[in-house]
């Protein structure tokens, strides 16, 4: 089957690779000159199969009010007269109940665990190296209240059979020895030992090369204008260069997916939530992390990537803007230097990307009302984590096969 994949980020490239392996004739279209040059370029680097939770959670509305007045706030809201923003925020708030949180977290963990298996298989199959480490994620608590509040996450992990360990201060230091220098600043943590780390940009570029070897064509520097639909079936894609025909199209355009789908009457509740990162060369390894540490107070991930530290986080709701706010850089610098001052901040590179967030935290994967048109988008902060499992699902669904896990509640139909 002739398939076009729209988007050459981690989700699009893994989808293309999986489809090519299944024997399809695949073309990837992206406006950038190469793969992984937008949201996949410098994300936090965590592959969080266990540390995987919806942002919409009980207590978040009250926390959000407090965050708005913090100097180093994990949430930044720049409200505007944007109906898409207002609708998305209202839907997210409706998911901030214990019942919805449990449902959403369970399906996120299901897809994440499936992705863990898929990534291990892909790594063994291709031999790709991407500064990977398989040492787990430590959710680090600075207060007793944070430690006690983690009980709901522990309950969800236990219910889904995901390994975890609740650590006291000394346990955190055993996992991350550099924390011994700041032991008075922490009270404990939640360790998910099956989590991994790795450079998403390196991985995506290496996999794109493997996909090309399988016959996948990459149309870089190509702007997507519209989907070509006739009589309720997708016929291809219209770009600034040509009309490209296909029997199936997979939309993996992240935050830009809703803009392409809207003219077809497909209302996809995905909205951009900007995140920021610093990439810092290590100057003193004894004060650098070994794996990924999530600073719960500031919702910032601090990750070891080879001889670098990647610091990523924050949620800025400001629409389709990619400017670099210096106040956001200050927050990242504060968190990492407070816990792991082993990097040379003077040589750090600063970046931002638009995460495609759904109001319930779960990506949208599956068919649409237009025959032959499939979605693989809305992964939020977990595109790297969920990419390989999502790609397997798309490979099965496009080919008319039966997915290995239940994917029905990942489809757009869950929004009514």
Curated annotation (Swiss-Prot):
Gene3D superfamilies for the chain: D-Amino Acid Oxidase, subunit A, domain 2, FAD/NAD(P)-binding domain
Record-linked InterPro entries: DadA, FAD-dep_OxRdtase, FAD/NAD-bd_sf
CC annotations in GO: cytoplasm; plasma membrane
Native species: Rhizobium johnstonii (strain DSM 114642 / LMG 32736 / 3841) (Rhizobium leguminosarum bv. viciae)
Pathway(s) of this molecule: Amino-acid degradation; D-alanine degradation; NH(3) and pyruvate from D-alanine: step 1/1
GO terms for MF: D-amino-acid dehydrogenase activity
Keyword Disulfide bond: no
Function: Oxidative deamination of D-amino acids.
Enzyme Commission identifier(s): 1.4.99.-
CC cofactor: FAD
TM helices/strands, residue ranges: none
Keyword Cell cycle found: no
Pfam families cross-referenced by the UniProt entry: DAO (PF01266)
Gene Ontology biological process terms in this record: D-alanine catabolic process
Binding of FAD, residues: 3-17
Record-given protein name: D-amino acid dehydrogenase
Main EC class the enzyme belongs to: oxidoreductase
Catalytic activity: a D-alpha-amino acid + A + H2O = a 2-oxocarboxylate + AH2 + NH4(+)
UniProtKB keywords: FAD, Flavoprotein, Oxidoreductase, Plasmid
Family of this protein: Belongs to the DadA oxidoreductase family.
């Amino acid at each position: 089957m002739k398939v076009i994949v729209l988007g050459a980020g981690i989700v699009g490239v893994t989808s293309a690779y999986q489809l090519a392996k299944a024997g399809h004739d695949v073309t990837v279209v992206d406006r950038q000159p190469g793969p992984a040059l937008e949201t996949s370029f410098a994300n936090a680097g965590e592959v969080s199969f266990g540390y995987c939770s919806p942002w919409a959670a009980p207590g978040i509305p009250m926390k959000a009010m407090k965050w708005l007045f913090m100097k180093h706030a994990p949430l930044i809201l720049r409200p505007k007269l944007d109906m898409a923003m207002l609708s998305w925020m209202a839907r997210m708030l409706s998911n901030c109940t214990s019942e919805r949180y449990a449902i959403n977290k369970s399906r996120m963990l299901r897809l994440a665990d499936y992705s863990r298996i898929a990534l291990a298989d892909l790594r063994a199959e291709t031999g790709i190296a991407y500064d990977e480490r398989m040492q787990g994620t430590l959710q680090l608590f600075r207060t007793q209240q944070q430690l006690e509040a983690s009980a709901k996450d522990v309950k969800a992990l236990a219910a889904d059979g995901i390994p975890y360990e609740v650590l006291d201060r000394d346990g955190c230091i055993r996992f991350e020895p550099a924390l011994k220098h700041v032991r008075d600043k922490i009270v404990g943590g939640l360790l998910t030992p099956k989590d991994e780390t790795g450079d998403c940009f390196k991985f995506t570029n290496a996999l794109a090369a493997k996909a090309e070897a399988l016959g996948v064509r990459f149309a870089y520097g190509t702007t997507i204008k519209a989907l070509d639909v006739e009589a309720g079936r997708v016929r291809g894609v219209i770009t600034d260069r040509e009309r490209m025909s296909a029997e199936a199209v997979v939309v993996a355009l992240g935050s830009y997916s809703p803009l392409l789908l809207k003219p077809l009457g497909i209302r996809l509740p995905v909205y951009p939530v900007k995140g920021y990162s610093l990439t810092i060369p290590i100057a003193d390894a004894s004060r650098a992390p070994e794996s990924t540490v999530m600073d719960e107070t500031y919702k910032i991930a601090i990750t070891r990537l080879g001889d670098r530290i990647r610091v990523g986080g924050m949620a800025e709701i400001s629409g389709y803007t990619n400017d670099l706010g210096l106040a956001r850089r200050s927050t990242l610098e504060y968190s990492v230097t407070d816990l792991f001052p082993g990097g040379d901040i003077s040589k750090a590179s600063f970046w931002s990307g638009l995460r495609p967030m759904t109001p319930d935290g779960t990506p949208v994967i599956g068919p649409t009302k237009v025959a032959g048109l499939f979605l693989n988008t809305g992964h939020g902060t977990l595109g790297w984590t969920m990419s390989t499992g999502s790609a397997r699902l798309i490979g099965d669904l496009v080919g008319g096969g039966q997915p290995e896990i239940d994917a029905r509640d990942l489809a757009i139909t869950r929004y009514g």
